[in-house]
From Swiss-Prot:
This is Probable fructoselysine utilization operon transcriptional repressor. The keyword Zinc-finger does not apply. Signal peptide: none annotated. May regulate the transcription of the frlABCDR operon, involved in the utilization of fructoselysine and psicoselysine.
Amino acid sequence: MSATDRYSHQLLYATVRQRLLDDIAQGVYQAGQQIPTENELCTQYNVSRITIRKAISDLVADGVLIRWQGKGTFVQSQKVENALLTVSGFTDFGVSQGKSTKEKVIEQERVSAAPFCEKLNIPGNSEVFHLCRVMYLDKEPLFIDSSWIPLSRYPDFDEIYVEGSSTYQLFQERFDTRVVSDKKTIDIFAATRPQAKWLKCELGEPLFRISKIAFDQNDKPVHVSELFCRANRITLTIDNKRH
């Protein structure tokens, strides 16, 4: 390829890349939406597949697009910043982001407290309410949240709770319990098949797993939880202050 041909190819690639960015910015292709196939884009922009492929690869590398094997290429959802030191429920989190929230309960049942009795400081022969929900931010799945709530401390919580209600508000209004602190640990977890289904991601895709113990105003454990979120959908921040 001559220098002139290489220059011409670079101009075409840069033009196609910018047009794709413009279409995304103008809402032609929205977050989570699949873009046209390479063949369709070749026809639309009247360029070669090599040019289209390079433009798409660059936008994938920049985090603008994401390739899903066997499905196609999609517009990447904007990352959400989640401050690790924030102690609030999901509803409050959505308000802080200026976004709407929604939840879908995928599992709720009474189970043995034995695996959680030490963390919750409750008898091993008691029961906890297991609540598993998919949490949506602006209609996009963001988290899978599994919580275990001690029924010995919060009787009939499973009967009081209804889908869509804030668990933290229920703690405060029904049991005079305010969640004021928590302890979190974070690791990376490969998405299982059910998690991939609910989070609309690839099987084995990296997820943040945030394990938490929440404490009330008297420093008693309120609940334990595990939150799973796509690593490419959220930015975790840690604020440290020297005392």
